[in-house]
């Protein structure tokens, strides 16, 4: 057996090419899935606790909303760093460190006594959670052998479950306990993940430490500063009375443009770039990253505003409008699961085309409104279901696309994918809410925004022809 490709599994048995025994694959997947579920729940769980935060911490609803913004900003900025750290220091180490940081920050969030401390801690919590996806992807690639394509594809179901049940759990904690419970519940879960990972996730391969490169601190600073400034700029648009010519928008946007220009200039000249340029914009990779940003903006960004649309245009109450996203989440779960197991037969492009067409149909139906005697709630739920089905069909393919070209960069590619989708989501929500804030008829305006999103996706569908195609396992 080639020593370079040996790895010791949790029971001490060597397996070729980093492949764990089937019984341990299930345990490993369950461990990383629990971490991903915990992180994805926390992305949405705070939404239903904002009024409780405002009351108990004696603050405004705007400041309470920054607990969500801080999580989004911290997550996006730290993602590429954790991807690189997984490559340099090992995915198991980064996974354990990320879970420990997330758990500690969650405990501190639950004990916070003012809104300003809570906002900072939410950013730190997100920084810990940002390491979950890159490290988990690398763990799957390293230890699942020929089953890794399906395991990575199933991640989409986990995220859909988390984002769907997050607001429900948040409401239950606020109603029957306290808002602090939405953070404190992560402590026993995080400890359980750490203990299980120490016992069952195989150690990182020794070759990682031997090929460690010098970390590109300048590249990390430029990308982090550019992303943070850019996200602050677009987040400002979502605030009340915000204007595109306001210094609070123009200054951070200018800083973001300058920092990102310097970042790309730097990595093209550096001997040890923070992220290899071809992984961002090279053949195949650049197309996948652009598509992920567009899909994230539409399926996570625009669709997140469906409850607001239901209320503004059709007068549906808060409970009814909130449950509309359950239809979208349920469809995403089912079709992500099915798509992960069909991927070897379909390849990447066919489900991405099919998913895109179904998403377009769902968005157009949302914009059009109910026909004949169909109740508005049923129409909106059916439309949201279609968007979720398209999202689910696309997820396994878009998660795997490109990975087989550079499996040694699996953690960085996973970080780039999640970062692109998150940026698309934040930008879309910020722009849409800014437009709606200045509208005299927000319901009808939002319908046009849904139609515009559908048109944008139609224009982007030809890009799928440039996605690297692959059938079978890799």
Regions found by a protein language model. Give the residues of each.
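Transmembrane helix-loop junctions and nearby membrane-interface residues
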Residues: 110-117, 198-204, 234-240, 264-267, ...
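Cytoplasmic-side transmembrane-helix entry/capping segments in multi-pass membrane proteins
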Residues: 148-158, 212-221, 280, 349-356
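Hydrophobic transmembrane-helix bundles of small-molecule transporters
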Residues: 176-291, 298, 453
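12-transmembrane solute porter fold
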Residues: 24-50, 57, 61-70, 74, ...
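Hydrophobic, well-ordered secondary-structure segments
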Residues: 1, 170, 185, 218, ...
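Hydrophobic alpha-helical membrane-insertion segments
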Residues: 49-53, 78, 187, 195, ...
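Residue-level signal for the membrane-embedded core of alpha-helical transmembrane segments
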Residues: 131, 225-228, 301, 393
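Transmembrane-helix bundle of Major Facilitator Superfamily
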Residues: 2-200, 357-360, 364-367, 380, ...
């Amino acid at each position: 057996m080639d020593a370079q490709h040996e790895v010791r599994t949790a029971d001490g048995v060597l397996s070729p090419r980093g492949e764990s025994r089937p019984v341990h694959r299930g345990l490993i997947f369950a461990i990383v899935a629990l971490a991903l579920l915990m992180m994805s729940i926390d992305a949405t769980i705070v939404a239903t606790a904002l009024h409780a935060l405002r009351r108990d911490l004696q603050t405004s609803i705007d400041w309470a909303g920054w607990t969500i913004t801080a999580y989004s900003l911290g997550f996006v900025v730290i993602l590429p760093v954790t991807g690189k750290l997984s490559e340099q220091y090992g995915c198991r180490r980064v996974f354990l460190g990320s879970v420990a940081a997330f758990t500690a920050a969650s405990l501190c969030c639950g004990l916070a006594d003012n809104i300003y401390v809570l906002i900072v801690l939410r950013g730190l919590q997100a920084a810990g959670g940002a390491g979950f996806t890159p490290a988990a992807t690398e763990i799957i690639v390293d230890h699942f052998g020929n089953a890794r394509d399906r395991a990575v594809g199933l991640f989409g179901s986990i995220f859909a479950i988390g984002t769907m049940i997050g607001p429900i759990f948040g409401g239950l904690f606020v109603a029957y306990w306290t808002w602090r419970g939405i953070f404190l519940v992560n402590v026993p879960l995080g400890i359980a993940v750490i203990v299980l990972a120490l016992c069952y996730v195989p150690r990182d391969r020794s070759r990682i430490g031997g090929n460690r490169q010098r970390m590109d601190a300048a590249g990390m600073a430029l990308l982090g500063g550019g992303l943070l400034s850019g996200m602050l700029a677009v987040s400002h648009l979502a605030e009340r009375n915000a204007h595109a010519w306001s210094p609070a928008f123009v200054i951070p946007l200018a800083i973001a443009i300058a920092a990102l220009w310097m970042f790309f200039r730097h990595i093209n000249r550096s001997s040890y770039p923070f992220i290899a340029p071809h992984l961002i914009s090279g053949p195949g990779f650049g197309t996948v990253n652009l598509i992920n940003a567009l899909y994230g903006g539409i399926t996570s960004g625009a669709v997140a505003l469906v409850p607001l649309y239901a209320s503004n245009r059709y007068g549906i109450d808060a409970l009814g409008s909130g449950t509309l996203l359950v239809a979208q989440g349920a469809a995403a779960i089912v079709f992500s699961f099915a798509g992960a197991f069909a991927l070897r037969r379909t390849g990447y492009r066919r489900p991405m085309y099919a998913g895109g067409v179904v998403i377009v149909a769902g968005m157009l139906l949302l914009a059009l409104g109910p026909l004949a005697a169909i109740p508005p709630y049923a129409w909106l739920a059916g439309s949201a279901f279609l968007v979720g089905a398209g999202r689910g069909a696309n997820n396994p393919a878009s998660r795997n696309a490109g990975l087989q070209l550079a499996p040694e960069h699996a953690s960085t590619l996973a970080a780039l994918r999640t970062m692109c989708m998150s940026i698309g989501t934040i930008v879309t929500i910020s722009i849409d809410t800014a437009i709606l804030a200045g509208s005299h008829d927000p319901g009808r305006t939002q319908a046009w925004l849904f139609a515009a999103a559908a048109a944008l996706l139609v224009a982007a569908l030809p890009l799928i022809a440039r996605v690297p195609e692959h059938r079978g396992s890799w």
